[in-house]
Amino acid sequence: MAQFYSAKRRVTTRQIITVKVNDLDSFGQGVARHNGKALFIPGLLPEESAEVIITEDKKQFARARVSRRLNDSPERETPRCPHFGVCGGCQQQHVSIALQQRSKSAALARLMKHEVKDIIAGAPWGYRRRARLSLNCPPDKPLQMGFRKAGSSDIVNVEQCPVLAPQLAALLPRIRACLASLHGTRHLGHVELVQAGSGTLMILRHTAPLSAADKEKLERFSHSEGLSLFLAPFSEILETVSGEAPWYDSHGLRLAFSPRDFIQVNEAVNQQMVARALEWLDVRAEDRVLDLFCGMGNFTLPLATRAASVVGVEGVPALVEKGRENAIRNGLHNVTFFHENLEEDVTKQPWAKNGFDKVLLDPARAGATGVMRHIIKLKPIRIVYVSCNPATLARDSEALVNAGYEVTRLAMLDMFPHTGHLESMVLFERM
């Protein structure tokens, strides 16, 4: 008779051990050493000692939770948010902003094997100009409105949020009261808030038709609060109830966008990021510049104010059309937008026949591994790579370095203070 055996699972004892943290990773976890390997402990800071319980024991690392903290680091802060520790939005409100930035910069420097000399940051509070709040109305219970718990689909009822733009934070109680008064509360999915240059937007997702009375109540609310209201009965449909088409400012230009289009959450960092990209590229009046993954023109249009000509390339047709409209709206006639599959060889396109002096790219988290060889063929003098994923940035950078480019500037973008998100910007120059 055959017998089957399963591999023994590594058993973690609930033994309490005392450790001292010597580092902070980019996600805000304290890092100690135990039994010759890294031990990650959420909630602890460098120079803090604690009694901890091992919760996961792997071959290369382990995880633990704090049983009792024995001392406090001078870098420890009192979290401003009453929901901190339960809400999944922020992970580092207990960490001084200086330590947050140092730990993120150190993680970036290790990955890129290059010193981080620039930190681009804005105010650490009230910076989020966009947020999505989940909605749920269980039978015979009040409406829930808030963010998801860490590692859970449960909703944390948010009464206040100190990282939201003040205009949005002030609206939360009134939005909750308005939505709770509707007859169709059980059909509400989520509400998105955006603080645009044109004013405040509210986008309400609902899963069944709203009654005429509910629509009228929402419209009255939008007028009384002076906000633009959009209803989203289906994922691809957007119904304008009140207000004007939104826009935001990028380097002194006005960019129109659809309420569901991606815009950078942190306005102050976005403005500095665009300005720094123009500075690093050293855009001159005779330059031809290529902007890959250009969206609706956040970088493209400011580049066009300085260069002889700019080409923006994007994989989403609606954003290409929006970019063209924004160029016309801002009186820029030296910029063209194209919809292309960026995995294909862009150097074979007619618009690339004269080459480019400078290239900027701002890809999604997956990076731009399929694009790097095409950029190399263009032989630009300078390349600025804006990244929201340091791992794919490090991978893509190798291709440029192997082709004779050198990292000459590296910046950490503190786009999301109090979270583990790490964004960055690199200047490569051809040697």
UniProtKB/Swiss-Prot annotation:
The gene is rlmD. [4Fe-4S] cluster binds at C81, C87, C90, C161. S-adenosyl-L-methionine binds at Q264, F293, N298, E314, N341, D362. It is an enzyme of class 2 (transferase). GO terms for biological process: rRNA base methylation. The keyword Transferase applies. This is 23S rRNA (uracil(1939)-C(5))-methyltransferase RlmD. It comes from Salmonella choleraesuis (strain SC-B67). Residues 10-68 form the TRAM domain. It holds the Pfam family tRNA_U5-meth_tr. Its EC number is 2.1.1.190. GO terms for molecular function: 4 iron, 4 sulfur cluster binding; iron ion binding; RNA binding; rRNA (uridine-C5-)-methyltransferase activity. It catalyses: uridine(1939) in 23S rRNA + S-adenosyl-L-methionine = 5-methyluridine(1939) in 23S rRNA + S-adenosyl-L-homocysteine + H(+). It comes from the Bacteria. Catalyzes the formation of 5-methyl-uridine at position 1939 (m5U1939) in 23S rRNA. PROSITE patterns: SAM_MT_RNA_M5U (PS51687), TRAM (PS50926), TRMA_1 (PS01230), TRMA_2 (PS01231). The active site is at C388 (nucleophile). Keywords: 4Fe-4S, Iron, Iron-sulfur, Metal-binding, Methyltransferase, rRNA processing, S-adenosyl-L-methionine, Transferase. Belongs to the class I-like SAM-binding methyltransferase superfamily. RNA M5U methyltransferase family. RlmD subfamily.
